[in-house]
């Protein structure tokens, strides 16, 4: 079940907790997340104003403004746009209720604990999205997140920045390669599916023509071997474009442009065997699939909430 579990208001300069919800669960996972809360609190001044930390089954999101950070813990499948809309509501209410002088001069932890009442009410509303009266305003937040997605904090970055490098240093060396190998892409669009099918079609056409060229080479003394190579290279390029469209890999965009360049070179070499419409079709499909690969980026955020 997707839901908000807890939230805190923290002063950025020193990590002093100003207010928080008081209904933490006592599970092992939740206790671990409380440690991450404390670690993030010490580093808020060094982080961007909108961040996400993924901790397995839970996500920690926060925003910072005017020296105060608003942090929340939710399940990993809680919609990203709702999470940051929730934080935005906390921020607006806190700024309206307390002036900067009070927050800057606060000495005791949780000196604004009465703000917990608003946190609890808002959390209950956001844990029942159907009852939200602010649905109409979520489109603005959705657009903002797409244009400026939250910075993704890695476990290695969090660990090394807080004096606990021994726990993370071994894994950090290869963390980039491991995470990129298992990185998920954004959901496929209709245009992406069409591009995948067209690329398969071009690959099949190149493959058929390649076998015909082999037959021609066996039946005559013509020098068709280079054409065979061009057809099969074109087939491989089309299939590799399909692979790049479906799976994430390092330097994915660069590879897609190089693959498109190979498709263009193959079709230039096959100019004598194809008419202009055939050449135009193959090159256009290659360009279209390259564009779809570029548009379908890795998932850097949780699923959006439909509005």
UniProtKB/Swiss-Prot annotation:
The modification Phosphoserine is found at residues 6, 8. Residues 2-187, 248-253, 296-307 are cytoplasmic. Its main location: endoplasmic reticulum. CDD domains: Longin. InterPro entries: Longin-like_dom_sf (IPR011012), Longin_dom (IPR010908), Sec22a/c (IPR043546). GO terms for cellular component: endoplasmic reticulum membrane. Residues 209-226, 272-274 are lumenal. GO terms for biological process: endoplasmic reticulum to Golgi vesicle-mediated transport; protein transport. The chain crosses the membrane at residues 188-208, 227-247, 254-271, 275-295. Signal peptide: none annotated. Belongs to the synaptobrevin family. This is Vesicle-trafficking protein SEC22a. It comes from Homo sapiens (Human).
């Amino acid at each position: 079940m997707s839901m908000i579990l807890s939230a805190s208001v923290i002063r950025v300069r020193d990590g002093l907790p100003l207010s928080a919800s008081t209904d933490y669960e006592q599970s092992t996972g939740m206790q671990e997340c409380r440690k991450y809360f404390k670690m993030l609190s010490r580093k808020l001044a060094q982080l961007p104003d909108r961040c996400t930390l993924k901790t397995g089954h839970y996500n920690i999101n926060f925003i910072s403004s005017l020296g105060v950070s608003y942090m929340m813990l939710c399940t990993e499948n809680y919609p990203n746009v709702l999470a940051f809309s929730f934080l935005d509501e906390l921020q607006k209410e806190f700024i309206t209720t307390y002036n900067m002088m009070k927050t800057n001069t606060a000495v005791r932890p949780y000196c604004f604990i009465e703000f917990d009442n608003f946190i609890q009410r808002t959390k209950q509303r956001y844990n029942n999205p159907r009852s939200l009266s602010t649905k109409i305003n979520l489109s603005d937040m959705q657009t903002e997140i797409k244009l400026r997605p939250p910075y993704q904090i890695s476990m290695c970055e969090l660990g090394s920045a807080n004096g606990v490098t021994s726990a993370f240093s071994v894994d950090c060396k290869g963390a980039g390669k491991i995470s990129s190998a298992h990185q998920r892409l954004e959901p496929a669009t209709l245009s992406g599916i069409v591009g995948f099918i067209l690329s398969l079609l071009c690959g099949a056409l190149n493959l058929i023509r390649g076998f015909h060229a082999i037959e021609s080479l066996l039946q005559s003394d013509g020098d068709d071997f280079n054409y065979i190579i061009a057809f099969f290279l074109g087939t491989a390029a089309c299939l590799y474009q399909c692979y790049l469209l479906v799976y994430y890999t390092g330097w994915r965009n660069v590879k897609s442009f190089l693959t498109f360049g190979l498709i263009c070179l193959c079709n230039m070499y096959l100019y004598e065997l194809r008419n202009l419409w055939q050449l135009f079709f193959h090159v256009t499909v290659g360009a279209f699939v390259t564009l779809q690969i570029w548009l379908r980026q890795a998932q850097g955020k949780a699923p959006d909430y439909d509005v």
